[in-house]
Amino acid sequence: MQNPKEKMDLSQSILSLIFIVSMGVISFLVIHPFILGFFWASMIVIATWPLMLKIQKILGGKRSLAVIIMIIILLLLFIIPVFFLVNSLIATSIPIIHWLGSNDLELPELAWLQNIPLMGRKIFNSYQTLLNSDGGELIHKIRPYMGHATEFFIIQVRNCGLFIVHSILMLFFSALLYWNGEKISISIHHFAYRLSEKNGKAILLLATQAVRAVALGVAVTALIQALLSGIGLLVSGVPYWALLMIIIFFSCLIQLGPLPILIPSIIWLYWNDDTTWGTILLIWSCFVFILDHILRPFFIRIGADLPILLTLSGVIGGLLTFGMIGLFIGPVVLVIFYRLTISWIYGISIASFLENTSLK
């Protein structure tokens, strides 16, 4: 016969479990709006912690001044690109708005469409039909897409607002993490030790190395490439160079490189018979492209002695899977999984990778 006390203990355990799970879910919903900002702050602080310590040492050990300087640096890094982006968009939009609003709005003839093989004549005739309809036919054609375009525009405005909010949260959390870095580090080490007494500390160190490797090998390389590409575009006289420079930065982050932007710019210069500057920009683009393959492995090695192919695969896969957050999630997960697998195959401790990289 079942003991009533055991039945009561089982019911109490189930209720306790339900209560704990409910509290966990509610807590997650409460902190959910802050997760993205806190995550970015954590990655930035981990990557720049050595820099903050050097600044603190120069300032005579004053943590408050070092934190203020780091926040100013982050402000400049986030505000200046956004300022250039908004300024470039405004500068680009004003001529287009004036052109669309002018009474003498005329669309080009585009006679060269006839020279396209096979379908050129059909495309040209359809285009001429649109021109001869005084815009009515054109409006009828694009009307089904206007709703989608408006929806897309509203979503992008919303995303810009969320970006500003998350940037403010990121700066706030960064200041807190810089100020209490040692205490938080001790708590994280205790948590890692509770998860695995044998490998917890080593896994934590590998994750830190992966974050710093990505920050140096991917983010810093992308920034250098964007700056050098922007200089080339500015000197060559390519319009909207600041906007293109920011696009190049994100293109380098997702490992496409600067060439998808630089090559059309070179073609544009040659198209406008500016062959001298087109040739100069071509040579400069080759230099920037080659520099990428030199700086990236060098900076990754500085950040950590990790497999370069594994790190870059983590960056690309993380970006495709998780978005910009995956820039750090991908390499960290892949590196830890790779080290765990190798340590299991060879029957060695993960900590040995921090001293011996012969199995890499």
From Swiss-Prot:
Transmembrane spans: 18-38, 39-59, 66-86, 161-181, 204-224, 230-250, 251-271, 280-300, 316-336
Keywords annotated in UniProt: Cell membrane, Membrane, Transmembrane, Transmembrane helix, Transport
Residues in the signal sequence: none
Compartment list: Cell membrane
Record's bilayer topology term: Multi-pass membrane protein
InterPro entries: AI-2E-like
Protein family: Belongs to the autoinducer-2 exporter (AI-2E) (TC 2.A.86) family.
Protein name: Putative transport protein BU123
